[in-house]
């Protein structure tokens, strides 16, 4: 892709997201979502093959449907209130449609079916943008309208997302699909804690950091399957250790960073005398931890059959420069001791 065109597309994606986050008018929010959607499709189709075309088409149809639901909710709200303000939804039907539209854009269950297929069909770099940056705009709108949302509806979507995000990743060998199901589960944790926006923001930051770290290491090793992940010992032994730590952190294993948001969300829910919901969420999170432990096992403790050429890859240095990777790994794995400092947010 032409560098000027690529830069223009990236700037459009950033502008669309920023437009959604800073706008207080529903029409500007809708325009921001459309800019975001139309700009990312050429990036998803960087590799000209049928799989990328199929993934881009699925993404376009899903996001178009979500945008249609969003505009329908805005029009219903306008009929009842006469206002275009983002902060408040005055009609229960408008609130329900808006929640469904944003859940579809975030890839939450039961509107999650597009996420694994689209992520699997696009390059790793496009998957990184899809699973990180593209979550910011819908999450910011969801945060702004949370007082108007039916609490039972959003908690149901959260529980379904955590459950399906864990179940779906159990039988996967494709790393992009595993990251997609992990994204679905993390969206469930974030929306379950929307009543405490600081914890939602903390969860979002840690999720984006961990996901960016994993995709950066996958791209450095050109790794897309469990089999190719097991060969990283031959290519970059040190990076293999970093992959292990980040995988366990994404699974929420203490004492790594990924445990922090889960711990704080469960603690906050129990303070509000909610026992059954956090217990179910904690048990369901074990499904995610299981498939991450399985990835860790196949990477660190097993060696799949490989040719002699594959075994000699350690002789050739990794030529890709990754300036920010050490910082990202530290943030993804070692921030749990900073948890007491977060008490100032309460």
Curated annotation (Swiss-Prot):
* UniProt keyword Metal-binding present: no
Where can this protein be found?
A: Mitochondrion inner membrane
Where do transmembrane segments lie in this chain?
3-23, 25-45, 67-87, 96-116, 122-142, 145-165, 200-220, 238-258, 273-293, 324-344
Supply the InterPro entries for this chain.
Complex_I_Subunit_2 (IPR050175), NADH_DH_su2_C (IPR010933), NADH_UbQ_OxRdtase_chain2 (IPR003917), ND/Mrp_TM (IPR001750)
The reaction(s) annotated as catalysed by this protein in its Swiss-Prot or TrEMBL entry are:
a ubiquinone + NADH + 5 H(+)(in) = a ubiquinol + NAD(+) + 4 H(+)(out)
The record's top EC class is translocase
- Signal peptide residue numbers: none
Question: Which parts of the chain are coiled coil?
Answer: none
Supply the EC number(s): 7.1.1.2
Gene Ontology biological process terms in this record: mitochondrial electron transport, NADH to ubiquinone; mitochondrial respiratory chain complex I assembly
| The entry's keywords | Electron transport, Membrane, Mitochondrion, Mitochondrion inner membrane, NAD, Respiratory chain, Translocase, Transmembrane, Transmembrane helix, Transport, Ubiquinone
Name the domain of life. Eukaryota
Gene Ontology molecular function terms on file = NADH dehydrogenase (ubiquinone) activity
The membrane topology of this protein is:
Multi-pass membrane protein
Report the GO terms under cellular component: mitochondrial inner membrane
Q: Does the keyword DNA damage apply?
A: no
Task performed by this protein: Core subunit of the mitochondrial membrane respiratory chain NADH dehydrogenase (Complex I) which catalyzes electron transfer from NADH through the respiratory chain, using ubiquinone as an electron acceptor. Essential for the catalytic activity and assembly of complex I.
Q: Which family does it belong to?
A: Belongs to the complex I subunit 2 family.
Q: How does it assemble?
A: Core subunit of respiratory chain NADH dehydrogenase (Complex I) which is composed of 45 different subunits. Interacts with TMEM242.
UniProt-recorded name of the protein: NADH-ubiquinone oxidoreductase chain 2
- What is the species listed in this Swiss-Prot or TrEMBL entry? Bos mutus grunniens
């Amino acid at each position: 892709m032409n560098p000027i065109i690529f830069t223009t597309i990236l700037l459009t994606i950033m502008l669309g997201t920023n437009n959604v986050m800073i706008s207080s008018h529903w029409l500007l929010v809708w325009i921001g979502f459309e800019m975001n959607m139309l700009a990312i499709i050429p990036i998803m189709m960087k590799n000209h093959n049928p799989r990328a075309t199929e993934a881009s088409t699925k993404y376009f149809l899903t996001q178009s449907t979500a945008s249609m639901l969003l505009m329908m909710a805005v029009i219903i709200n306008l009929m009842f209130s006469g206002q275009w303000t983002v902060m408040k939804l005055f009609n229960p039907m408008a609130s329900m449609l808006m929640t469904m539209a944003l859940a579809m854009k975030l890839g939450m269950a039961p509107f999650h079916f597009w996420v694994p297929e689209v992520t699997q069909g696009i390059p790793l770099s496009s998957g990184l943008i899809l699973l990180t940056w593209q979550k910011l705009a819908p999450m910011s709108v969801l945060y702004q309208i949370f007082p108007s949302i039916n609490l039972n509806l959003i908690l149901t979507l959260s529980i379904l997302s955590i459950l399906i995000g864990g179940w779906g990743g159990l039988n996967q060998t494709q790393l992009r699909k595993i990251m997609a199901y992990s994204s679905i589960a993390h969206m469930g944790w974030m929306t379950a804690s929307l009543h405490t926006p600081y914890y939602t923001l903390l969860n979002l930051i840690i999720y984006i950091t961990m996901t960016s770290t994993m995709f950066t290491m996958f791209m450095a090793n050109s790794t897309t399957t469990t089999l190719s992940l097991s060969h990283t010992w031959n290519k970059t032994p040190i990076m293999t250790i970093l992959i292990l730590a980040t995988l366990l952190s994404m699974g929420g294993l203490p004492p790594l960073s990924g445990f922090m948001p889960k711990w704080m969300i469960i603690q906050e829910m129990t303070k509000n005398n909610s026992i059954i919901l956090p217990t179910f969420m904690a048990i369901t999170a074990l499904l995610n931890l299981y498939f991450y432990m399985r990835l860790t096992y196949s990477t660190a403790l097993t060696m799949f059959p490989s040719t002699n050429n594959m075994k000699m890859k350690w002789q050739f240095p990794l030529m890709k420069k990754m300036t920010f990777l050490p910082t990202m790994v530290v943030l993804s794995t070692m921030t749990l001791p900073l948890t007491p400092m977060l008490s100032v947010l309460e």
